[in-house]
């Protein structure tokens, strides 16, 4: 008779413990109910990127001195710099500059070490294409400034998201 009573008491304690765990989980769920959503509706809402965001690289052809520092500091030797030595003035003349963003890891070393600051990171991150060869940007494509999403009236911009506290 006593083993049956102790089993019944253990069953009751386990039931109370299970109900307490379910209640704790439900309280955590309810604490998240009044927070703002973390996800955004992407094509119609876009985040304003931070100041130090590393997006597409912008290139200013007139400032470049063809020193190839960007190629030397790149971990994958990505920028292609074609130049010609002008013998009469003994300086390099830049002919072509290109970066393949299909291979680029957006580390920012080329921007950081450029002595003339002809490279800069933009806030543009929408580089998707159907053909990977379209990601090879020459100096003309690199020279284009990105469109500002703040000026686009069809897109709702979101300035800050709720931070996740860990």
From Swiss-Prot:
One of its GO terms (cellular component) is chloroplast thylakoid membrane. Pfam families: Fer4. [4Fe-4S] cluster 2 binds at residues 74, 104, 107, 110. Its cofactor is [4Fe-4S] cluster. One of its GO terms (biological process) is photosynthesis, light reaction. GO terms for molecular function: 4 iron, 4 sulfur cluster binding; iron ion binding; NADH dehydrogenase (ubiquinone) activity; quinone binding. The keyword Phosphoprotein does not apply. It is an enzyme of class 7 (translocase). Residues 55-84, 95-124 form the 4Fe-4S ferredoxin-type domain. Binds 2 [4Fe-4S] clusters per subunit. It is a peripheral membrane protein. It is found in: Plastid, Chloroplast thylakoid membrane. [4Fe-4S] cluster 1 binds at residues 64, 67, 70, 114. NDH is composed of at least 16 different subunits, 5 of which are encoded in the nucleus. Belongs to the complex I 23 kDa subunit family. NDH shuttles electrons from NAD(P)H:plastoquinone, via FMN and iron-sulfur (Fe-S) centers, to quinones in the photosynthetic chain and possibly in a chloroplast respiratory chain. The immediate electron acceptor for the enzyme in this species is believed to be plastoquinone. Couples the redox reaction to proton translocation, and thus conserves the redox energy in a proton gradient. This is NAD(P)H-quinone oxidoreductase subunit I, chloroplastic.
């Amino acid at each position: 008779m006593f083993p049956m009573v102790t089993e019944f008491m253990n069953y009751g304690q386990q039931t109370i413990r299970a109900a307490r765990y379910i209640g704790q989980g439900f309280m955590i769920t309810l604490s998240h109910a009044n927070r703002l959503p973390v996800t955004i509706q992407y094509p119609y809402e876009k985040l304003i990127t931070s100041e130090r965001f590393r997006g597409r690289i912008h290139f200013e052809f007139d400032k470049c001195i063809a020193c190839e520092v960007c190629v030397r500091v790149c971990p994958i030797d990505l920028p292609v710099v074609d130049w010609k030595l002008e013998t009469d003035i003994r300086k390099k003349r830049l002919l072509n500059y290109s970066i393949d963003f299909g291979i680029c890891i957006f580390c920012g070393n080329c921007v950081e070490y450029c002595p003339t600051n002809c490279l800069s990171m933009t806030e543009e991150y929408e580089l998707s294409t159907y053909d990977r060869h379209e990601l090879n940007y020459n100096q003309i494509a690199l020279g284009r400034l990105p469109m500002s999403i703040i000026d686009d009236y069809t897109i709702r911009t979101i300035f800050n998201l709720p931070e996740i506290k860990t």
